[in-house]
Design a protein with these regions (language model features):
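PLP-dependent aminotransferase class I/II
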Residues: 4-13, 17, 33, 68-178
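Active-site phosphate-binding strand-loop segment of PLP-dependent enzymes
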Residues: 1-58, 64-66
């Protein structure tokens, strides 16, 4: 969440032992990396979102599935075309991205590294400014290159959280921890 990546080696091994596909949800981690390994390169396939609140936004959302597995790629293509292959043996959807949306995303991708550097610099300023306050700021982990999709702070004290939320017209992104 929020651009963080975690070590998934135990989960990957669990999936591999049981012949379960490891699908990497990288919707909020585009541009992030952990120990030089980029988000979206870990799973059997990975998914990214281009919704309006993501690092790269399309004009009407959308997303992409990445894989280097030919069978997974074939199956994803079938599902996005109403389940059509030679016959309709799979439930599918009309999940094709409009060309205009794809072109806008393509152009925005060209600025991703620069925008990420700016978000990281702002996050460092926030970390310094909030250092002496009774809040929990995003953790800085060795080896993590965080895209800072969101800069999330937590309050230990609920009354302080309520006062700050009201004063700043802030919101709680996820009400209950996952």
């Amino acid at each position: 969440l929020f651009g963080y990546m975690e070590d998934t080696s135990v989960l990957q091994a669990f999936c591999k032992e049981r012949n379960i596909l490891f699908i990497e949800d990288a919707a909020q981690a585009l541009g992030s990396s952990l120990n030089g390994v980029h988000a979206g390169t870990i799973g059997d396939c990975s998914v990214f979102s281009f919704n309006s609140n993501k690092v790269i936004a399309g004009i009407n959302g959308g997303g992409v599935v990445l894989t280097d597995d030919d069978e997974i790629a074939k199956r994803v293509k079938q599902i996005r075309r109403h389940g059509k292959d030679k016959t309709f043996d799979t439930l599918g959807y009309n999940s094709r991205m409009y060309v205009l949306n794809a072109r806008i995303i393509e152009q925005r991708m060209k600025h991703m590294e620069d925008n990420q550097s700016k978000r990281q610099a702002i996050a460092q300023q926030y970390n310094q400014a909030f250092a002496d306050l009774p809040i929990v700021t995003p953790k800085v982990t060795n080896g993590l290159n965080n895209n800072y999709h969101k800069y999330v702070i937590r309050f230990e004290d609920k009354d302080t959280r309520k006062r700050v939320k009201k004063a700043l017209n802030a919101s709680i992104h996820y009400e209950t921890p996952l």
